[in-house]
Amino acid sequence: MSDVLTGVWADLVGQEKAVGVLRRATESQPGRSSHAMSHAWLITGPPGSGRSNAAKAFAAALQCVDHGCGQCNACRTALSGAHPDVTLVRTEALSIGVDEVRELVRRAAMNPVHGRHQVVVVEDADRITERGADALLKAIEEPAPKTVWLLCAPTPEDVIVTIRSRCRRLHLATPRDEAVADLLVRRDGIAPELAAEAARAGQGHIGRARRLASDQEARARRSAIGELPTRLRSLGDCLQAAEDLVNQASEEAAAATAQVDSAERAELEKALGFGSSGARPRNAQAAMRDLEKQQSARLKRLQRDALDRVLTELTAYHRDVLAIQTGAVRPEEENALRGARLVNAGWSGALHRVADSHSPEHTVATIDAILAARNSLERGVTPLLVMETLLIAMTGADHARW
């Protein structure tokens, strides 16, 4: 078990090394040592490793006189997104454009109102467009004295080179299953056995593990995905399963956005001065249209995220199948705590049936098809077409190409 982190760092599972770097930076004086504070950071790591949590914790520590106690008003408001000198940038769109970046640059140049720094956290810095990066570059090259930029992305290569070359880099590791399970037990009160199962299924993704541990519907959806490879017998099965997966993703996204959409619409109507008589101000139609466009983009992204989770589960499933076929995992190792083992040890029977009914070459081709499906979703290909093509490929038919 890893050492338990405290204060604002408490939720950064398995990131002791990275937290050490951030702590030393908050406690150092500019220019005094190799641990000196930098005005621009690029925090990278695999999905679910806690990039945005690390950035928010760092932002809180920078505002705290005790360097991240986790108890003071500065820490609490920074972590919750309510601190006036910490700007948290999340996007539902596929990119962060130049206009949004220019507004961030303008805000970053302001003096802190209450805090010690003006901190800007960009959770999806890999989505900044080339023109947006040009607008950001000057602000990073010539920062205001108390401004700190915290950019988050999966890898340094995902960020435009002119930006990443001017940032101090910090990489987060994939948390070990034991560390994730310990967090679920300690913080969320999950039963140890369920926490261990969810942590393994989450494959180092803390948010996914928490969802599986706390949401019975999420576990049921995962079980249904685990049954999928053994029940695709015909073209009709593939088409029906693809439709079901897309519909389920749409319903999941709609449920997640319904309340937020309604609140945003009510807030905008109030701001525009909608009267009780139903009369609409002259500029209302354009403003409402813009809001609907933003909400539609968010809905599509959440649907895509839901399908991406399906693809992640299918990748892990066929990784296990390949491990069985090649002898990389022996029967006595399938449920080991670490090392060579099956991610989905609870599905061992089904995995062995699939392994026996297909060749390793077919399994590799299936994994390639899953990766191609993920890339197609990223490019905006119609989700139903993507899933139909993938499931047909999984049955052993000729692989279609997008």
Show the residue positions of the predicted features.
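Conserved Walker B
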Residues: 124-128, 156
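Flexible loop/N-cap segments at domain edges
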Residues: 317
